[in-house]
Structure formats: structure tokens, C-alpha cells
Amino acid sequence: MDIIVHPRVLQRHPDLSEADVLSAWENMISFLPRLESSPMRYIAIGSDPRGRLIEMVAQKASDGTWVIFHAMTPPSKKTLIELKFVRR
């Protein structure tokens, strides 16, 4: 499975490296499809090598490559609720 991190992620979040985001994707703790989006996007939380939780949003390109176009740490409260990590 090919995975790429959109360059904008690293520009907007200099506290994250490409390796951090890829590791978090590979070590996903939880993910859900966002059914209302077209093309379908997935929201996920995973941990990087330092144990930080990273929120990610990705979609699958037509060639099967996953493109992570949003990542940040720590995850937002909205994402934690959406993925059932915390209650409202």
C-alpha cells in the first residue's frame, strides 16, 4: 500500500515530520470513513514514534495511493469525540 503525506501538512505543522505522520498512519488506533464526503475520506488517530497521538484525514487516489492531506497533534476534541475516544 502506497501512502504519501501532502507537503502542505508539513508546511502547516512544522512540529510533525513525514516519518511521524507515516508512522501514525501505520500505527492507527482508530479510524472511520466520513460517509458524507465525496470522494470518501477517512479520519484516523495513530501514534508516532514518540508516542504522540496524531489526527489524520486521508483519501484514496484513483491509483490506490493513500494521500494524507491533514495531520496535527494533539488531535482535536471534535475528532476524539467522532472516533469515540472521549464523551461529549
What does each model-identified segment do?
Residues 1-88:
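Ribonuclease/tRNase effector modules and their secretory precursors
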